[in-house]
Amino acid sequence: MTTRNLDKLASIDAQLRQLVPAKVSEDDKLVEYDALLLDRFLDILQDLHGEDLKETVQECYELSAEYEAKHDPKKLEELGNVLTSLDPGDSIVIAKAFSHMLNLANLAEEVQIAYRRRQKLKKKGDFGDESNATTESDIEETFKKLVGDLKKSPQEVFDAIKNQTVDLVLTAHPTQSVRRSLLQKHGRIRDCLAQLYAKDITPDDKQELDEALQREIQAAFRTDEIRRTPPTPQDEMRAGMSYFHETIWKGVPKFLRRVDTALKNIGINERVPYNAPLIQFSSWMGGDRDGNPRVTPEVTRDVCLLARMMAANLYYSQIEDLMFELSMWRCNEELRVRADDLQRSSRRDEKHYIEFWKQVPPNEPYRVILGDVRDKLYQTRERARQLLGHGYSEIPEEATYTNIEQFLEPLELCYRSLCACGDLSIADGSLLDFLRQVSTFGLSLVRLDIRQESDRHTDVLDAITQHLEIGSYRDWSEERRQEWLLSELSGKRPLFGPDLPKTEEIADVLDTFHVIAELPADCFGAYIISMATAPSDVLAVELLQRECRVRQPLRVVPLFEKLADLDAAPAAVARLFSIEWYRNRINGKQEVMIGYSDSGKDAGRLSAAWQLYKAQEELIQVAKEFDVKLTMFHGRGGTVGRGGGPAHLAILSQPPETIHGSLRVTVQGEVIEQSFGEEHLCFRTLQRFTAATLEHGMHPPVSPKPEWRALMDEIAVVATEKYRSIVFKEPRFVEYFRLATPELEYGRMNIGSRPSKRKPSGGIESLRAIPWIFAWTQTRFHLPVWLGFGAAFKYAIEKDIKNLRMLQEMYNAWPFFRVTIDLVEMVFAKGDPGIAALFDKLLVSEDLWSFGELLRSKYEETKSLLLQIAGHKDLLEGDPYLKQRLRLRDSYITTLNVCQAYTLKRIRDPDYSVTPRPHISKEYMEAKPATELVNLNPTSEYAPGLEDTLILTMKGIAAGMQNTG
């Protein structure tokens, strides 16, 4: 310990109480929750690693807090000296402790949000939601607003809600920094904390919960946070599917009941039909092969069978509860006849069930029917298990459910019979919930989208045309390609046989189509073509599906993401719709995906957001001309730089008429945990998406005035030029980026199954959008989010001072512009150029220091212009909740930032000398529990402990920032 007077060192807990803003409202329990978790954790830290280490944690925290108060860079240096003087084991423990404390702060927040939500529901009042500066409506408020304020009839609301669809597409983007083992422990900590503050808790309950809390915090701290091997796509799929087990499976029927209740409260005495497609789930895990060589046809087959097995297992685990519930003897004639037939034909085979294992008596007809459903579910599950394990199954396909209609039929029969016998209230119990689950999840739990780059299809067709000796498809013009594709699609002859010469890549593409042909059609959703530019890209996939004998072809979805592609998208889609063969094929429905990540990386956030807005307007116009219903599929990331931010705000700021009751949106990486990690979060996510989609359709946001459009067009050009002049044209930029951020070390984190680069060599262009953002988030500089905004606003205001008033008017009256600015403001609130300056000082060569200073001056300039336009004196002045939450975690994050900067220095500069603490002899070191941590990574090529310390800081900062990639 340094010579600072220990007696004067305040505990973190006391520090917190001084630091934290006052309670934001009466029902604000965040500080209490946070302090309780911290107290418990510090006790555990002392027990496991001794008092010295606990005091070092407190010293680091205090120095960070002092820095946060005055932003004095000397404090960062002092903190750096404390951190670099630690031996390798202690250094890992400190990084682990701060990372852990940030995870605990997140859990305290989630419990606080749930608590305030319950308080709100008790009072039936409205409140500004805490995760953004705008009020979020629940489903009941949305209905009342539509009927009361906007004078829609209850019937109109009912018709709109039962015909709308929100399809949430879970993707395994490599940003879920927390291991599944830890997510489960975090869930239990959350539960303990929520129960500890329940009103009716007894002293004994309290004591037991406190012990459980201590146990779970210790178990989480004792779990290795670092993945020692990269996850496979199957691992990612299993991780994604675990949310269905934990929350989504039960959450969907519970949410739909709330919709029923809300309808009742506006005078509609009907329930949402059980087959109304309100919520759907899809997945990219194991289907997204764009730039991921690890997603092979075998992987796709595996994840589909795995999902079918999980779905059958979930239904199977619930069917006996339903059999218990439906014990009635009275039924209609149709059901009686069916039950009698089953009784006669059933010979009990050797399956030993726990309940209803003997033949069900004939006076329980519903149980007879459901017993047969149970048998089939058992066979369905076992067949999928055998196919997954051995590639074949002894169970014949006809003994299982192969499509959803077969599965629904006996359940619908039970429902009709109960209604006919006057037992409607019983029919609307668990049976209705079960029917709704079947309609939502089907037999495959989620539908798997396939994504592939357009070039890979071109390679296959080029091989075919060369084999047929009719030329090189790759060299043909677009017209020639279309002509040939359409003549083949209109004809009947097969294009190629088994003698087609195939490279490994070509075989991979064709085998993927064969897997689609082999598995049941309900396993799959869309076939998405990335880097799509022309109608031939779509027709190529249609032809390959036909050639590989896909009986029910997947809908083909072009994905437009770069700025130029977005600009050309409406014309490309119009050309596609003008092809008669294609119009007949799609039956008046088309889906188009727009990508937020690459457009942001290509042109900066402001221009990307505006281009995405305009492209959607134009695409909808094209679809109207051809009388096609267009569904927009939004590929949003978790971070603001990749189109992230609160979901309902994003929806309500889309252009009018672009959602129209059908929305598809990706839920990525760590956002899955924030959306579905816990029951109330799942409920809230389903509610937000449904309410916002309904409101957007029935009460569209305003269209921008012509003068707003003109100004946006003008400033977007300036923003793009400024962004590209720095990111792509400035010769010093790539070197600066690699030195000033942990981008080069990112690959060591084993976060995802996908490589972080599209091509092994190359500059910023080849870097994926995710590591690009992740790296800047780590240094709290967030460059991709704000770069370009300042130059654009400065240009507009200098050109004509009236433009400042116009920008302020746009902020106040136009949801799209407001949301864009608010999200950047939130990122500024999380940023800190002082931290970026420390990284520069330690890691960047001196000749680049002036470049770093230039970027930081642009950061400050952009921030002040942004506040001027929003009419705010301080960042987040309109959102006290978020401000409080960010202040609470700043000191933890700062310690990790400093730790990361100095660790990178030691990794990159082996000659960097540090002064180790005196009096830690080798024998003493080996006896310390902390040294065991160094041995977890025996193969590291760096000095002991450095690599693990670095990875732990990355994970901790990711947890603190909450939207990492």
UniProtKB/Swiss-Prot annotation:
InterPro entries: PEP_COase, PEP_COase_bac/pln-type, PEP_COase_Lys_AS, PEPCASE_His_AS, Pyrv/PenolPyrv_kinase-like_dom. It is found in: Cytoplasm. Disulfide bonds: none annotated. Pfam families: PEPcase. It comes from the Eukaryota. Its cofactor is Mg(2+). One of its GO terms (molecular function) is phosphoenolpyruvate carboxylase activity. It catalyses: oxaloacetate + phosphate = phosphoenolpyruvate + hydrogencarbonate. The active site is at H173, K601. By light-reversible phosphorylation. The modification Phosphoserine is found at S11. GO terms for cellular component: cytosol. Keywords: Allosteric enzyme, Carbon dioxide fixation, Cytoplasm, Lyase, Magnesium, Phosphoprotein, Photosynthesis. Its EC number is 4.1.1.31. One of its GO terms (biological process) is tricarboxylic acid cycle. Pathway: Photosynthesis; C3 acid pathway. Its main location: cytoplasm. Through the carboxylation of phosphoenolpyruvate (PEP) it forms oxaloacetate, a four-carbon dicarboxylic acid source for the tricarboxylic acid cycle. Belongs to the PEPCase type 1 family. Homotetramer. This is Phosphoenolpyruvate carboxylase. The lineage of its organism: Eukaryota, Viridiplantae, Streptophyta, Embryophyta, Tracheophyta. The gene is PPC1.
